[in-house]
Amino acid sequence: MSTEHMEELNDQQIVRREKMAALREQGIDPFGKRFERTANSQELKDKYANLDKEQLHDKNETATIAGRLVTKRGKGKVGFAHLQDREGQIQIYVRKDAVGEENYEIFKKADLGDFLGVEGEVMRTDMGELSIKATHITHLSKALRPLPEKFHGLTDVETIYRKRYLDLISNRESFERFVTRSKIISEIRRYLDQKGFLEVETPVLHNEAGGAAARPFITHHNAQNIDMVLRIATELHLKRLIVGGMERVYEIGRIFRNEGMDATHNPEFTSIEVYQAYADFQDIMDLTEGIIQHAAKSVKGDGPVNYQGTEIKINKPFKRVHMVDAIKEITGVDFWQDMTLEEAKAIAAEKKVPVEKHYTEVGHIINAFFEEFVEETLIQPTFVYGHPVAVSPLAKKNPEDQRFTDRFELFIMTKEYGNAFTELNDPIDQLSRFEAQAKAKELGDDEATGIDYDYIEALEYGMPPTGGLGIGIDRLCMLLTDTTTIRDVLLFPTMK
């Protein structure tokens, strides 16, 4: 280590490095080796929950635990400390006469943040706290930096997001939130696996952005000297697998969109897309409700979910409403009536709904009305279906009214949680939709996509009637952990 670097260290860091050197002099590796424990903190608490101090003493049971040293007190020949593992904390009670002088020195010189292994007798203190009375201490790893001053509840938001490891050490609530996230994803997998779906993996690097209306990240493949994009959706590759006969597939994975950041948006996020052959959007509506209710039940139990003080009846059947009916109910405007684009624009002007340059069809105006007036009213789980063809380039037209598609979005607390439809499997219709998207792109719609001719070719080999679904995992995790910002459910959110 250079003198220059040593001068950058504070007193605590210097002392910790000196202790590291002292351990080496004693023949102890400061960064340890494999250590076998017999239980974690919670397993011990569960196992001995019903035994008092005397009963534990009579049982004379032993255990071996390991964890990070997070508290330490005592002096002379006796010390108390707490070790923290994945499940929580447990107290250790160390006596010099029980572990020996040399072993006691290891404990005595251990700093907060160090990892220790402890073998000993399971006991309960006079205060009733389950503890391990040490018979041997093993040094497992040296922490060369002290934990932050207020590590029992890190509060600096910048540090929480940039140094998530410190947040996880210090904030049990945060730690449990990410455990819950993991469980939600596991339960979604379990639900779909039990229904015969296959989990698959599709490329992250695409030649053409597609499957969603979003601006992509662009990168360059040096060996082939071609520009590529990070995927904005997994849709088109998953539907190729339906063409290939896989019938029921899903993928949980990262999606990348080169767009703004706010409380519910991060440039990279996790979604699940699900495709089922021989199904339509009504079947997928049932599937979506089942997935979300199963995930909610697994982490919140059978009842409703409380989100920021609002009771969300996630355990009850979700409301289902056509987009046009929802608009009519709130604004009085009836888009079931046939009208020209100019007539629709006039109604928009009257209602002060902004009209963009690329709004070339009545369907664009209908969607703008929905976003302006309806979205903010959708608190309880609501399936809004019947989106206009103009804003649904991959969805099948409704056979009874060709202006609209067999598509739905799920809204909860005014936010979209899922998007699904009966998939468009007519390659000729699909090509014309792609061409309309390409035209919108030329008119300034930077979320419109180009034409994926390879996907058109796949459809020409025949795709069965199919229902498809996309759910934003991060937003679902926010809902089920009562979190207001997406950064609190992403272990490593995007930072400047």
Curated annotation (Swiss-Prot):
- Gene Ontology BP term (one): lysyl-tRNA aminoacylation
- Tell me the superkingdom of the source: Bacteria
Main subcellular localization, coarse class?
cytoplasm
What the entry lists under Gene3D superfamilies is as follows: Bira Bifunctional Protein, Domain 2, Nucleic acid-binding proteins
| Keyword match Nucleotide-binding | yes
Top-level EC class: ligase
GO molecular-function annotation terms? ATP binding; catalytic activity, acting on a protein; lysine-tRNA ligase activity; magnesium ion binding; transferase activity; tRNA binding
The protein's Enzyme Commission number: 6.1.1.6
Q: Which reaction does it catalyse?
A: tRNA(Lys) + L-lysine + ATP = L-lysyl-tRNA(Lys) + AMP + diphosphate
Does the record bear Ligase in its keywords?
yes
In which compartments does the protein localize?
Cytoplasm
Q: Which UniProt keywords apply?
A: Aminoacyl-tRNA synthetase, ATP-binding, Cytoplasm, Ligase, Magnesium, Metal-binding, Nucleotide-binding, Protein biosynthesis
Positions contributing to Mg(2+) 2 binding: E416
Q: Which InterPro entries match?
A: Aa-tRNA-synt_II, aa-tRNA-synth_II, aa-tRNA-synth_II/BPL/LPL, Lys-tRNA-ligase_II, Lys-tRNA-ligase_II_bac/euk, Lys-tRNA-ligase_II_N, Lys-tRNA-synth_II_C, NA-bd_OB-fold
- Named cofactor requirement(s): Mg(2+)
Q: Which GO terms describe its cellular component?
A: cytosol
The cofactor remark states:
Binds 3 Mg(2+) ions per subunit.
The entry marks the following residues as binding Mg(2+) 1, namely E409, E416
Assembly, in brief, is:
Homodimer.
Give the similarity note.
Answer: Belongs to the class-II aminoacyl-tRNA synthetase family.
Protein name listed in UniProt: Lysine--tRNA ligase
To which species is this protein native? Streptococcus pneumoniae (strain CGSP14)
Taxonomy, top ranks, is: Bacteria, Bacillati, Bacillota, Bacilli, Lactobacillales
